[in-house]
């Protein structure tokens, strides 16, 4: 028998160790007595989220990399080929771009459990320039990063539609004032408040893109996050830039949707919440959308785009 000791960060709780037959083992002087294989199960403390689903550092001899699975409300990892005393460290790994983000407000570098439980993919870590924690109405105490929804909004709402309907295209609401800030949440809130002051009930038949982004329900926005909103110009540029480092492949792991045009593998036109203080010949105000990898198109409010939302965690 070998000694297995476990050290864990404080976000992990309810740790149990079982042998190959499934028998739960008891601590013996701070260690578990194990054979050549065992399974470690644990949960994540709700008040410690957002956090990693678990990253393991092993000191000792085991035969394979440790990967986490999910079963019956626990996260699990199996150790095999144990042939010496082993110290297992369960670490709360910091988030990285391209990590999967899950509806329980956790993240992982690989897909764990049901892919439909994945809210989306992290496309930026840390607070973006111009984003302010005070804009989030007390929903967040810190900005850890940003997540792009796993499925296009068109799956829920149908075909691509213009930024807003004709009645509202000659309005300049004010989101044009910060074109280079990560302020999609503040922009979205400004547009929602504008509609409210006008006595408008938000729907697909007025401020279409804001309605679709904030009413998106195909993938869950976890409690403890901002909730879904329509990203700003620079936020959606960052999503497109992530194309070059593999966000397309990550999205396709957790979604069956066609996220790029089949002919050239470019992005769909992604809608943004950032206006432009210019008008076209019809008097319609401008809007930015994302036409290609990292390229913002100078469009107008009668242009059709896909307003797939983002969230802040």
Tell me what each language-model feature is.
Residues 1-31:
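Conserved N-terminal submotifs of small, disulfide-stabilized extracellular modules
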Residues 1-9, 70-94:
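Conserved "repeat-terminator" motif of extracellular CCP/Sushi domains
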Residues 91-224, 304-312:
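Short, compositionally biased
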Residues 35-37, 225:
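Extended extracellular/luminal ectodomain segments enriched in beta-structured repeat modules
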Residues 192, 198-229, 233-303, 310-312:
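An exposed tryptophan-centered "aromatic clamp" motif
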Residues 6, 37-78:
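Surface-exposed interfaces of beta-sheet-rich extracellular modules
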Residues 62-83, 284-301:
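Short, surface-exposed beta-strand/turn "edge" patches of beta-sheet domains
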């Amino acid at each position: 028998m070998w000694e297995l000791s476990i050290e864990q960060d404080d976000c992990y709780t309810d740790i149990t160790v079982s042998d190959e037959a499934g028998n739960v083992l008891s601590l013996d002087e701070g260690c578990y007595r194990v054979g050549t294989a065992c399974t470690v199960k644990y949960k994540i403390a709700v008040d410690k989220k957002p956090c990693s689903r678990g990253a393991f550092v092993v000191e000792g001899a085991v035969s394979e990399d440790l990967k986490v699975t999910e079963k019956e409300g626990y996260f699990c990892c199996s150790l095999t080929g144990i042939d010496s005393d082993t110290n297992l460290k369960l670490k709360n790994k910091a988030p990285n771009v391209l990590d999967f983000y899950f509806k329980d407000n956790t993240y992982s570098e690989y897909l764990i459990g049901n892919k439909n439980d994945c809210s989306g993919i992290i496309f930026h870590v840390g607070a973006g320039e111009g984003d302010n924690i005070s804009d989030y109405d007390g929903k967040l105490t810190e900005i850890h990063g940003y997540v792009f929804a796993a499925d296009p909004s068109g799956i829920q709402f149908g075909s691509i539609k213009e930024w807003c309907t004709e009645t509202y295209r000659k309005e300049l609401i004010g989101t044009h004032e910060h074109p280079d800030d990560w302020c999609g949440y503040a922009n979205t809130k400004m547009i929602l408040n504008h509609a409210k002051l006008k006595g408008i009930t938000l729907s697909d038949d007025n401020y279409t893109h804001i309605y679709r982004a904030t009413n998106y329900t195909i993938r869950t926005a976890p409690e403890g996050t901002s909730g879904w909103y329509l990203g700003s110009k620079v936020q959606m540029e960052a999503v497109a830039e992530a194309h070059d480092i593999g966000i397309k492949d990550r999205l396709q792991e957790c979604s069956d949707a066609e996220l790029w045009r089949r002919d050239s593998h470019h992005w769909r036109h992604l809608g943004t919440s950032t206006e432009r203080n210019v008008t076209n010949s019809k008097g319609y105000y401008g809007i930015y959308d994302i036409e290609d990898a990292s390229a913002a198109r100078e469009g107008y409010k009668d242009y059709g785009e896909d307003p797939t939302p983002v969230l802040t965690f």
